Amino acid sequence: MNTVKTVRELRAAVARARGEGKRIGFVPTMGNLHSGHAALVTKAAQRADFVVASIFVNPLQFGANEDLDKYPRTLAADQERLVQAGCNLLFAPTVEEMYPDGMSVQTRVSVPQLSEGLCGASRPGHFEGVATVVNKLFNMVQPDLAVFGEKDYQQLAVIRAMVRDLNMPIQIIGEPTVRAEDGLALSSRNGYLTPEQRTAAPALYRTLQHIAAGIGRGQRDFAALVAEGQAQLSAAGFRPDYLEVRHAVSLRPAVINDRDLVVIAAAYLGNTRLIDNLYLHLEEKTA
């Protein structure tokens, strides 16, 4: 695996691979990689001939009071993990390389509606930052396909919409969430948890499972199920940001006739914000 730091080097390396007739796969990350990221790269390697990963902690998607400065930078360990997962090329640019004229004058990409509510409500500007940097990376790499984790469900929906609306010839692949044995979704932010918080953290996924099980049994009072779930989270030491049942594609609030749903949540344990979701498909009842 080669590592490049400039757009010029990136484009030259991708052009060589494409000139050899290779299908290009892409996995954008912010580094501090774990097994969940490795699964994305492995999926890309299964679907493409040449896999590009990027590591860039994007300031544009962090709010004023968020953890940009303390976000871990672990390049050497990340490079080793990428090699093991089957990555061919790592793009690790500086902020200056990505935003040469500064972020204040950077053209922004905004995906309306899908970016609003849920994480967008408590993190204003976050998805604009995500859409902008992913758009830039797509233009730099020009991949045939890109792989994103389903743990960041709203982000995946935003990116799918951006690619569709802007007619980008890129296949977007969602990879199922990788979990620890106790059910906690793998996340770079799990490292911020104290041992006690880490023990409590799986309650987030158990709450989603509880709500999904109720829906599966035929309960359609989503508000009542969510209220139960919020009580469970609070009892486990969480401070819920949101917990909702949404339509799995449009992310609008679910209605009783919906067949594809996602139970989606964000909650704080101490100062650490964790997110998770659980998709469920309901079969239509036959007479």
Swiss-Prot record:
* InterPro entries (UniProt xref): Pantoate_ligase, Pantoate_ligase_C, Rossmann-like_a/b/a_fold
Annotated active site: 37
Q: What is its EC number?
A: 6.3.2.1
Q: Which residues bind (R)-pantoate?
A: 61, 155
What residue range is the signal peptide?
none
Q: Which GO terms describe its molecular function?
A: ATP binding; pantoate-beta-alanine ligase activity
Q: Does the keyword Endoplasmic reticulum apply?
A: no
Named in its record, the pathway it takes part in is: Cofactor biosynthesis; (R)-pantothenate biosynthesis; (R)-pantothenate from (R)-pantoate and beta-alanine: step 1/1
Q: Where does ATP bind?
A: 30-37, 149-152, 178, 186-189
Where is this protein chiefly located? cytoplasm
Q: Where in the cell is it found?
A: Cytoplasm
Query: Which keywords does this chain's UniProt record carry?
Result: ATP-binding, Cytoplasm, Ligase, Nucleotide-binding, Pantothenate biosynthesis
What are the binding positions for beta-alanine in this chain? 61
Q: Give coiled-coil spans as residue ranges.
A: none
Please verify whether the record's keywords include Ligase: yes
Any Gene Ontology biological process: pantothenate biosynthetic process
Q: Which Pfam families match?
A: Pantoate_ligase
Q: Which Gene3D superfamilies match?
A: HUPs, Pantoate-beta-alanine ligase, C-terminal domain
User: Domain of life of the organism in this record?
Assistant: Bacteria
Which reactions are catalysed by this chain?
A: (R)-pantoate + beta-alanine + ATP = (R)-pantothenate + AMP + diphosphate + H(+)
GO cellular component terms, semicolon-separated = cytosol
Q: How does it assemble?
A: Homodimer.
Q: Which family does it belong to?
A: Belongs to the pantothenate synthetase family.
What the protein does comes down to: Catalyzes the condensation of pantoate with beta-alanine in an ATP-dependent reaction via a pantoyl-adenylate intermediate.
- Other known facts: The reaction proceeds by a bi uni uni bi ping pong mechanism.
Put simply, this protein is called Pantothenate synthetase
Q: From what organism does this protein derive?
A: Pseudomonas putida (strain ATCC 47054 / DSM 6125 / CFBP 8728 / NCIMB 11950 / KT2440)
